[in-house]
Amino acid sequence: MTIKPLIILPDPVLRQQSKLIEQVDAEVLRLADDMLETMYDAPGIGLAAIQIGVPRRMLVIDVAREGEEKTPVVFINPEILKVSDDISTYEEGCLSIPDYYAEVERPASLTVQYVGRDGKQQTVEADGLLATCLQHEIDHLNGVLFIDHISRLKRDMVIKKFTKAARAKI
């Protein structure tokens, strides 16, 4: 397993559409392991493949609380089948937008269909933090960032801040 460098805003890679994974093979499983290692190292609770520069429809999530046993799940080609009408608000952050957090409203629960590590199709019904994390990470697969769900003024300020920081590194 290898810790991969994270793609940081304003890198345009984050706005790419990720492509379907045709087959769960050794390369895909290695990518999943690298993603988990990278996520835990960051540390974070979710990571989409695009965040390490791989435009494939895969994400990893572990919403276990600190001190609890790890419960990593690999979601390949996740697809939202159903969302609730109820809305919940969570303060979200993102490994690709370090040290910035904002309140985001999303459906409180949802049903997601995906392919697991074993190559078999599965379905999960999620609510709470898992539902929010799934929506956040699936957004990444579609080139959407959590800052796209906040006010335009706040989003523009965040993008300006990260663009300025990126220029300073050049």
Curated annotation (Swiss-Prot):
Classification via InterPro entries: Peptide_deformylase, Peptide_deformylase_sf
Reaction it catalyzes: N-terminal N-formyl-L-methionyl-[peptide] + H2O = N-terminal L-methionyl-[peptide] + formate
CDD domains per record: Pep_deformylase
Ligand binding (Fe cation): 94, 136, 140
The record's free-text note on cofactor binding: Binds 1 Fe(2+) ion.
Active site: 137
Protein biosynthesis as UniProt keyword: yes
UniProt KW Ligase keyword: no
Stated role: Removes the formyl group from the N-terminal Met of newly synthesized proteins. Requires at least a dipeptide for an efficient rate of reaction. N-terminal L-methionine is a prerequisite for activity but the enzyme has broad specificity at other positions.
PANTHER family in alphabetical order: PEPTIDE DEFORMYLASE
Protein name: Peptide deformylase
Name of the gene encoding the protein in the UniProt record: def
